[in-house]
Amino acid sequence: METAEGPHLVRLYVYDMSRGLARRLSPVMLGKQLEGIWHTSIIVFDEEFFYGREGITSCLPGRTMLGEPDSVMELGITEVTEEIFLEYLSSLGESGFSGESYHLFDHNCNTFSNEVAQFLTGKKIPSYITELPSEVLSTPLGQALRPLLDSVQIQPAGGNIFNRQSGPS
């Protein structure tokens, strides 16, 4: 168990929502190679934090309905305390990361992971993850499917939901 003080390891969990189908089908369907359809979360203080249609949520690492991540990246070390981090998450939930703010292409789990990674470590998550929406939308099929895909909201089942009223539940 991590202590409240001292350096804390920050990791990025990366899940392929397509379970390998994007790698096989994207060249035919989109005319370009995609390695996956990425969902990400931040792991710090022995907790997995992610964002979706319910807002900011947390659970024990690897305990979402997605199971174990496809890859784990060490983003660095943070000196931010757990208390300050939870206050930061609460303020994010009140400002730009409420459930109503979620948008599959423009404001999603990867947007959240990128912002939190920068807060904790000063580093961004890999660009192949954050640039995926523009890669898909740059194709004719991506443009044709955008109205349908705009209605998609992803929320892996987790545990605690952060919101204005009560913080972690």
From Swiss-Prot:
EC code: 3.4.-.-, 3.1.2.22
Pfam families recorded: Peptidase_C97 (PF05903)
InterPro entries: PPPDE_dom, PPPDE_sf
Positions of the PPPDE domain: 8-150
GO CC, one annotated term: cytoplasm
Reactions catalysed according to its record: S-hexadecanoyl-L-cysteinyl-[protein] + H2O = L-cysteinyl-[protein] + hexadecanoate + H(+)
UniProt keyword annotation of Metal-binding present: no
MF (Gene Ontology): long-chain fatty acyl-CoA hydrolase activity; palmitoyl-(protein) hydrolase activity; peptidase activity
Keywords in alphabetical order: Cytoplasm, Hydrolase, Nucleus, Protease
Residue span of motif Nuclear export signal 1: 84-92
Function description: Protease which deconjugates SUMO1, SUMO2 and SUMO3 from some substrate proteins. Has isopeptidase but not SUMO-processing activity. Collaborates with ubqln4 in the export of ubiquitinated proteins from the nucleus to the cytoplasm. Exhibits palmitoyl protein thioesterase (S-depalmitoylation) activity towards synthetic substrates 4-methylumbelliferyl-6-S-palmitoyl-beta-D-glucopyranoside and S-depalmitoylation probe 5 (DPP-5).
Record text on subunit structure and interactions: Homodimer.
Protein name stated in the entry: Desumoylating isopeptidase 1
Biological source species: Xenopus laevis (African clawed frog)
